[in-house]
Protein backbone atom coordinates (compact mmCIF):
# COMPACT_ATOMS: atom_id res chain seq x y z
CA UNK A 1 0.00 0.00 0.00
CA UNK A 2 1.28 3.48 -0.91
CA UNK A 3 -0.10 6.44 1.06
CA UNK A 4 -0.16 9.69 -0.96
CA UNK A 5 -2.21 11.96 1.28
CA UNK A 6 -3.32 12.43 4.86
CA UNK A 7 -7.05 11.77 5.16
CA UNK A 8 -7.60 13.48 8.52
CA UNK A 9 -6.46 13.59 12.12
CA UNK A 10 -7.84 11.78 15.16
CA UNK A 11 -8.17 15.14 16.92
CA UNK A 12 -11.13 15.77 14.59
CA UNK A 13 -12.82 12.38 15.09
CA UNK A 14 -16.56 12.13 14.76
CA UNK A 15 -18.43 9.86 17.17
CA UNK A 16 -18.87 7.23 14.45
CA UNK A 17 -15.09 7.06 13.84
CA UNK A 18 -14.18 6.45 17.49
CA UNK A 19 -15.13 2.77 17.28
CA UNK A 20 -12.89 1.92 14.33
CA UNK A 21 -9.93 -0.40 14.73
CA UNK A 22 -6.73 1.65 14.87
CA UNK A 23 -3.41 0.40 13.53
CA UNK A 24 -0.44 2.63 14.38
CA UNK A 25 2.76 3.66 12.67
CA UNK A 26 5.34 4.77 15.27
CA UNK A 27 7.73 7.43 13.94
CA UNK A 28 10.76 9.21 15.32
CA UNK A 29 10.46 12.99 15.45
CA UNK A 30 12.95 13.34 12.59
CA UNK A 31 10.78 11.09 10.37
CA UNK A 32 7.80 13.45 10.59
CA UNK A 33 9.41 15.73 7.98
CA UNK A 34 10.03 12.95 5.44
CA UNK A 35 7.54 12.91 2.57
CA UNK A 36 8.81 9.57 1.25
CA UNK A 37 9.48 6.61 3.55
CA UNK A 38 8.70 2.95 4.13
CA UNK A 39 7.26 2.09 7.53
CA UNK A 40 5.83 -0.90 9.39
CA UNK A 41 2.66 -0.71 11.47
CA UNK A 42 2.29 -2.13 14.96
CA UNK A 43 0.48 -5.05 13.26
CA UNK A 44 3.51 -5.84 11.09
CA UNK A 45 2.08 -4.44 7.85
CA UNK A 46 4.57 -2.61 5.65
CA UNK A 47 3.34 0.54 3.91
CA UNK A 48 4.96 3.19 1.80
CA UNK A 49 4.39 6.88 2.37
CA UNK A 50 4.83 9.16 -0.64
CA UNK A 51 2.98 12.38 0.13
CA UNK A 52 2.03 14.49 -2.88
CA UNK A 53 2.09 17.71 -0.86
CA UNK A 54 5.22 18.93 0.97
CA UNK A 55 3.73 18.81 4.47
CA UNK A 56 5.02 17.40 7.74
CA UNK A 57 3.30 14.47 9.39
CA UNK A 58 1.87 15.05 12.87
CA UNK A 59 0.72 12.90 15.76
CA UNK A 60 -2.74 11.55 15.00
CA UNK A 61 -2.62 11.94 11.21
CA UNK A 62 -4.80 9.31 9.55
CA UNK A 63 -2.91 7.71 6.67
CA UNK A 64 -5.63 5.25 5.66
CA UNK A 65 -9.27 4.74 6.58
CA UNK A 66 -12.04 2.37 5.49
CA UNK A 67 -15.35 1.38 7.08
CA UNK A 68 -13.75 -0.58 9.94
CA UNK A 69 -10.04 0.22 10.12
CA UNK A 70 -7.57 3.05 10.01
CA UNK A 71 -3.80 3.55 10.07
CA UNK A 72 -2.68 6.43 12.29
CA UNK A 73 0.64 8.17 12.96
CA UNK A 74 1.96 7.97 16.52
CA UNK A 75 5.21 9.55 17.65
CA UNK A 76 7.91 7.96 19.78
CA UNK A 77 8.82 9.89 22.90
CA UNK A 78 11.72 12.30 22.63
CA UNK A 79 14.56 13.17 25.04
CA UNK A 80 13.68 16.79 25.87
CA UNK A 81 14.56 19.74 27.99
CA UNK A 82 11.28 21.25 29.18
CA UNK A 83 12.10 24.86 29.99
CA UNK A 84 9.76 26.69 32.38
CA UNK A 85 10.72 30.37 32.51
CA UNK A 86 9.17 32.25 35.43
CA UNK A 87 9.29 35.70 33.86
CA UNK A 88 9.24 37.35 30.46
CA UNK A 89 12.89 38.30 31.07
CA UNK A 90 13.89 34.65 31.59
CA UNK A 91 11.91 33.61 28.53
CA UNK A 92 13.58 36.30 26.42
CA UNK A 93 17.07 35.46 27.70
CA UNK A 94 16.83 31.74 26.99
CA UNK A 95 15.00 32.21 23.68
CA UNK A 96 17.80 34.55 22.55
CA UNK A 97 20.48 32.05 23.60
CA UNK A 98 18.73 29.14 21.88
CA UNK A 99 18.18 31.21 18.75
CA UNK A 100 21.89 32.01 18.59
CA UNK A 101 22.52 28.26 18.60
CA UNK A 102 19.92 27.76 15.84
CA UNK A 103 18.09 25.20 18.01
CA UNK A 104 14.52 24.44 16.99
CA UNK A 105 12.01 24.83 19.81
CA UNK A 106 8.34 24.15 20.39
CA UNK A 107 6.09 26.06 22.75
CA UNK A 108 3.12 25.40 25.00
CA UNK A 109 1.33 28.01 27.11
CA UNK A 110 3.99 27.80 29.85
CA UNK A 111 6.92 25.80 28.44
CA UNK A 112 9.61 25.79 25.80
CA UNK A 113 10.59 22.34 24.50
CA UNK A 114 14.00 21.63 22.97
CA UNK A 115 15.71 18.36 22.16
CA UNK A 116 18.14 17.38 24.90
CA UNK A 117 21.60 18.92 24.68
CA UNK A 118 24.00 18.83 27.64
CA UNK A 119 25.33 22.28 26.71
CA UNK A 120 21.84 23.78 26.86
CA UNK A 121 21.25 22.02 30.18
CA UNK A 122 24.46 23.58 31.51
CA UNK A 123 23.36 27.00 30.25
CA UNK A 124 19.99 26.66 31.98
CA UNK A 125 21.74 25.77 35.24
CA UNK A 126 24.11 28.75 34.89
CA UNK A 127 21.21 31.14 34.19
CA UNK A 128 19.08 29.66 36.99
CA UNK A 129 16.15 29.06 34.65
CA UNK A 130 13.88 26.21 35.79
CA UNK A 131 13.73 23.17 33.53
CA UNK A 132 13.12 19.43 33.58
CA UNK A 133 14.80 16.66 31.59
CA UNK A 134 11.93 14.47 30.31
CA UNK A 135 10.98 11.80 27.84
CA UNK A 136 7.87 13.20 26.16
CA UNK A 137 5.90 12.83 22.95
CA UNK A 138 5.58 15.93 20.81
CA UNK A 139 2.90 16.37 18.16
CA UNK A 140 5.06 18.01 15.50
CA UNK A 141 8.59 17.74 14.17
CA UNK A 142 11.39 19.92 15.47
CA UNK A 143 12.28 21.83 12.33
CA UNK A 144 15.44 23.77 11.58
CA UNK A 145 14.82 27.00 9.71
CA UNK A 146 17.60 28.00 7.38
CA UNK A 147 18.79 31.57 6.95
CA UNK A 148 21.87 33.58 6.12
CA UNK A 149 23.75 36.49 7.64
CA UNK A 150 24.05 38.58 4.45
Curated annotation (Swiss-Prot):
Keyword Chaperone: yes
GO MF annotations in UniProt: nickel cation binding; unfolded protein binding
GO CC annotation terms, alphabetical: cytoplasm
Primary site of residence: cytoplasm
Keywords per UniProt: Chaperone, Cytoplasm, Nickel, Nickel insertion
Compartments it resides in: Cytoplasm
Functional description taken from the UniProt entry: Involved in urease metallocenter assembly. Binds nickel. Probably functions as a nickel donor during metallocenter assembly.
The protein's name: Urease accessory protein UreE
Organism in which the protein naturally occurs: Staphylococcus saprophyticus subsp. saprophyticus (strain ATCC 15305 / DSM 20229 / NCIMB 8711 / NCTC 7292 / S-41)
Amino acid sequence: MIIEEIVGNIANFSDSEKGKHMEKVYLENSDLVKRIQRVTTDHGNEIGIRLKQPIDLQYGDILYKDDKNMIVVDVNSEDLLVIKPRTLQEMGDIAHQLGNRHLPAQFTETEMLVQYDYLVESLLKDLGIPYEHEDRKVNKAFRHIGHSHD
